[in-house]
């Protein structure tokens, strides 16, 4: 793991910021959060006013990205982005980059790309990279973790413009985004998952590819949040195994973090 991000609305954000402050060698950024997807573990916006469009009927953030795209007022989105970044900075974080929880600000559910342009604009204000792929390959379009709802023609018609805009405001971003999926036999056993990841990494194209995981230790708290807790435990096990690093090295993959990316894209 070379980079990570922190969710400002969540209760353990302060501890994570203190870790980042004590370990500046790690590239840790802000995971812009506009969805609250778990049934019983939920959170609300950081902002204390003008957040009505960002909340569901219970006052929490919307559970799904499509709800954000359909309901969010763009001025309230902008204010909440600033609030989350500034909250984590106040808690001790010097952010290395921005990314977005569940892709709720990408516009890929309904084609509301004004949200993505807003994020890029604010990332430029802070001088931070943002996780958004420079192009969309067929593998990305069909990736169930990315869960893109609009057609490739529509997204490709705008991605060039959005990336040109990102570069114009000084925002670095990876070339590709390709996370592992859980829709096949890799969900059945740890060995299957390991073999799947090892094969997936052989398919990475030339350039900067970001893949992401959600590693966690097995505990009652994790099991209380999600029924798919085993996936996160397997991710922790696999990516703490020295053999995985050896496999990555054998493929000629060079690991970088978001600070490296920012320097590369200057």
Regions from the PLM with identified roles:
Residues 2-5, 25-31, 95-99, 129-131, ...:
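Structural preference for beta-strand elements that scaffold enzyme active sites
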Residues 7-9, 31-37, 103, 135-138, ...:
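Active-site beta-loop-alpha junctions enriched in small/polar residues
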Residues 25-27, 31-82:
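Substrate-binding cleft of extracellular glycoside hydrolase catalytic domains
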Residues 163-195:
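Active-site rim beta-loop-alpha module in soluble metabolic enzymes
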């Amino acid at each position: 793991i070379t980079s990570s991000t922190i969710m400002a609305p969540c209760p353990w954000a302060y501890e994570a910021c203190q870790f980042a402050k004590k370990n500046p060698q790690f590239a840790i950024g802000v995971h812009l959060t506009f969805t609250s997807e778990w049934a019983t573990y939920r959170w609300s916006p950081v902002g204390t006013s003008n957040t009505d469009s960002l909340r569901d009927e219970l006052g929490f953030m919307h559970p799904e990205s499509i709800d954000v795209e359909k309901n969010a007022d763009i001025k309230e989105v902008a204010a909440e982005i600033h609030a989350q970044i500034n909250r984590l900075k106040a808690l001790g974080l010097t952010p290395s980059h921005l990314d977005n929880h569940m892709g709720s600000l990408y516009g890929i559910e309904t084609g509301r790309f004004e949200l993505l342009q807003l994020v890029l604009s604010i990332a430029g204000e802070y001088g931070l990279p943002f996780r958004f792929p420079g192009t969309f390959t067929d593998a990305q379009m069909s990736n169930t973790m990315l869960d893109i709802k609009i057609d490739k023609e529509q997204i490709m018609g705008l991605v060039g413009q959005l990336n040109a805009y990102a570069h114009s405001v000084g925002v670095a971003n990876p070339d590709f985004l390709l996370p592992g999926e859980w829709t096949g036999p890799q969900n059945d056993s740890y060995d299957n998952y390991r073999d799947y990841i090892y094969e997936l990494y052989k398919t990475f194209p030339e350039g900067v590819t970001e893949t992401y995981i959600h590693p966690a230790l097995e505990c009652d708290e994790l099991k209380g949040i999600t029924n798919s807790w085993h996936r996160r435990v397997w991710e922790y096990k696999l990516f703490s195994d020295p053999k995985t690093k050896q496999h990555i090295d054998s493929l000629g993959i060079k690991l970088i973090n978001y600070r490296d990316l920012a320097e590369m894209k200057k």
